[in-house]
Amino acid sequence: MSRVGKSPVALQGAEVALSDERITVKGPLGTISQAANSLVKVVNDNGTLKFEPVDESREANAMSGTMRALVANMVNGVTKGFERKLTLVGVGYRAQAQGDKLNLSLGFSHPVVHQMPEGIKAETPTQTEIVIKGINKQQVGQVAAEVRGYRPPEPYKGKGVRYANEVVILKETKKK
C-alpha cells in the first residue's frame, strides 16, 4: 500500500459527503468537489478519512495515495485556504487588482488584463506584490503560473514576474 495512502486525513472541522462518484468537502471557506476513483475505497471514521485500495494492484495502491493527497488538499483549502505570492521586479512594472481582474503593467505597449476564474481572488498589497488566494490548490497554482508566464524572470537582470520564494540565477554578460 502507498505510504501516503496509509496515513488518514483529519477533517479539522470540515464536513465530507461521500458518494460512489464524488467526494465533496464543505468548510468555512466554501465547498469543493472531486471525482472519486473506483480503485479506492474511502471510509469516514470518526472525523478522519481512510483510503484503502480495492485490490492489491499497483494502480490501486498508487491511486490510494493520490486520492488521499487530493482530499487532504481539499480539506486544507476549505478550512485554511491556499495562497501564492508573486513579486514584480523591474522599472515601471506594476500590478493592480480590480474586482475579478488583475491589471498588469509589464513593459509592453499595452496593459495586460488577467481575468480571474471563479473562486480565485487576487490582492495587491503594494504595486509590486500580488497575492493569489483560493480554496483549490491546483487552481491557485495555475493562475499564479499564468500571471508569471506573461513576463518570466529574464536571466541577465532578473526583471519580470517571479514567485516570492523563487531564486533567479543571473548569468554574466558577454565580455570583450
From Swiss-Prot:
Keywords: Ribonucleoprotein, Ribosomal protein, RNA-binding, rRNA-binding. One of its GO terms (cellular component) is cytosolic large ribosomal subunit. GO terms for biological process: cytoplasmic translation. Coiled coil: none annotated. Pfam families: Ribosomal_L6 (PF00347). One of its GO terms (molecular function) is rRNA binding. This protein binds to the 23S rRNA, and is important in its secondary structure. It is located near the subunit interface in the base of the L7/L12 stalk, and near the tRNA binding site of the peptidyltransferase center. Part of the 50S ribosomal subunit. PANTHER family: 60S/50S RIBOSOMAL PROTEIN L6/L9 (PTHR11655), LARGE RIBOSOMAL SUBUNIT PROTEIN UL6M (PTHR11655:SF14). Belongs to the universal ribosomal protein uL6 family. NCBIfam families: L6_bact. This is Large ribosomal subunit protein uL6. It comes from Paraburkholderia xenovorans (strain LB400).
